[in-house]
UniProtKB/Swiss-Prot annotation:
<feature type="transmembrane region" description="Helical">
    <location>
        <begin position="129"/>
        <end position="149"/>
    </location>
</feature>
<comment type="similarity">
    <text>Belongs to the UbiA prenyltransferase family. Protoheme IX farnesyltransferase subfamily.</text>
</comment>
<dbReference type="GO" id="GO:0008495">
    <property type="term" value="F:protoheme IX farnesyltransferase activity"/>
</dbReference>
<comment type="function">
    <text>Converts heme B (protoheme IX) to heme O by substitution of the vinyl group on carbon 2 of heme B porphyrin ring with a hydroxyethyl farnesyl side group.</text>
</comment>
<feature type="transmembrane region" description="Helical">
    <location>
        <begin position="108"/>
        <end position="128"/>
    </location>
</feature>
<comment type="subunit">
    <text>Interacts with CtaA.</text>
</comment>
<keyword id="KW-0350">Heme biosynthesis</keyword>
<feature type="transmembrane region" description="Helical">
    <location>
        <begin position="180"/>
        <end position="202"/>
    </location>
</feature>
<feature type="transmembrane region" description="Helical">
    <location>
        <begin position="59"/>
        <end position="79"/>
    </location>
</feature>
<keyword id="KW-1003">Cell membrane</keyword>
<protein>
    <recommendedName>
        <fullName>Protoheme IX farnesyltransferase 1</fullName>
        <ecNumber>2.5.1.141</ecNumber>
    </recommendedName>
</protein>
<comment type="pathway">
    <text>Porphyrin-containing compound metabolism; heme O biosynthesis; heme O from protoheme: step 1/1.</text>
</comment>
<feature type="transmembrane region" description="Helical">
    <location>
        <begin position="30"/>
        <end position="50"/>
    </location>
</feature>
<dbReference type="GO" id="GO:0005886">
    <property type="term" value="C:plasma membrane"/>
</dbReference>
<dbReference type="InterPro" id="IPR006369">
    <property type="entry name" value="Protohaem_IX_farnesylTrfase"/>
</dbReference>
<keyword id="KW-0472">Membrane</keyword>
<feature type="transmembrane region" description="Helical">
    <location>
        <begin position="253"/>
        <end position="273"/>
    </location>
</feature>
Length: 305
């Protein structure tokens, strides 16, 4: 039972608690965590199907892998916020982050980031040694190669950042089958090729913000036309990659090809688009739907492979 004073206190602290939770989720980049967990699970699920092992007999592996992946991805996101706290106030997209508003102090952010990374790695190593090592590779690729090195110095920063974004499905696969195989390579390449056109679309929408923050994104350095050609290149590279997964059957290959061709057609329309911002937004939204549908379809078709 609660008395009136307790109820009043609860009502008064409710919005504050909600705000703290919202800021914490922003700190760990929960959207990126969730999307990467989809690809992590896809890699793990594919490994179960390809090795004929039953997932119900290895629920501990699934738990360790998913929690571990969530923690290292969230920890890496928090570390990125810690590193970028000097430029985030400049950009509209990032100026409300808790590291900018002062909600979370730098030492707290660093503590959270390191704690998540350490606990996450312990869980991944509990799943398999290979999963733990790939987790370390992902952390290094995102925190060091991307956040600390290429992001502020090189126009190829998006491509460098795509390495870390392609590792989660490898982590999932390695947790079940450490030897990996063609299936794991296919998922890595698909995710690697998908990311540049996705993030270039976002960069086009935020070109002036990146310019103000002196981040050498491709649209800032080379312009929109060069960016469109680069997006087209990566989508063309993506076209044959689903065929590295022939085990999933003709249904999957047909769906994946349709998704890729739809993206290709939209990319080609960019060269005649009258409103680049509107086109970039359509490309960005399509890329999100593309990734979601593709990886969910891999999970579904793998059951019948």
């Amino acid at each position: 039972m609660s008395n009136g004073r307790t109820l009043a206190a609860t009502r008064n602290t409710g919005p504050e608690t909600t705000s703290v939770v919202k800021d914490f989720l922003a700190l760990i980049k929960i959207g990126i965590v969730n999307s990467n967990l989809v690809t992590t699970f896809t890699g793990m699920w594919l490994a179960f199907q390809f090795t004929s092992r039953h997932f119900l007999q290895e629920l501990d592996v699934i738990l360790f892998t998913m929690l571990g992946a969530a923690l290292i991805i969230g920890g890496s996101g928090a570390m990125n916020n810690f590193i970028d706290q000097d430029i985030d106030p400049i950009m509209k997209r990032t100026k409300a982050r808790p590291t900018v508003t002062g909600r979370f102090k730098p030492n707290f952010v660093l503590t959270i980031a390191l704690s998540f990374l350490i606990v996450g790695e312990i869980l991944l190593f509990a799943a398999s040694f290979a999963a733990g090592m790939w987790g370390l590779a992902g952390i290094f690729a995102y925190v060091v190669l991307y956040s600390m090195w290429s992001k502020r110095k090189h126009v190829s920063n998006t491509v460098v950042g795509s390495i870390s974004g392609a590792i989660p499905p490898i982590i999932g696969f390695a947790a079940v089958e450490p030897a990996l195989g063609p299936g794991a390579l296919a998922l890595f390449l698909i995710m690697f090729a998908w990311q540049p056109p996705h993030f270039y679309a976002l960069a086009m929408k935020r070109t002036e913000e990146y310019r103000a923050a002196k981040i050498p994104m491709l649209p800032v350095v080379k312009g929109f036309k060069r960016t469109k050609y680069s997006m087209l290149f990566w989508i063309l590279l993506l076209l044959p990659l689903p065929f590295l997964l022939p085990e999933l059957g003709i249904g999957f290959l047909t769906l994946a090809t349709a998704l890729n061709l739809g993206w290709l057609i939209l990319a080609l329309k960019g060269f005649t688009a009258k409103d680049d911002m509107k086109w970039a937004n359509r490309m960005f939204i399509y890329s999100l739907n593309h990734m979601t549908i593709l990886f969910v379809s891999i999970i579904i078709f793998a059951v019948f492979s």
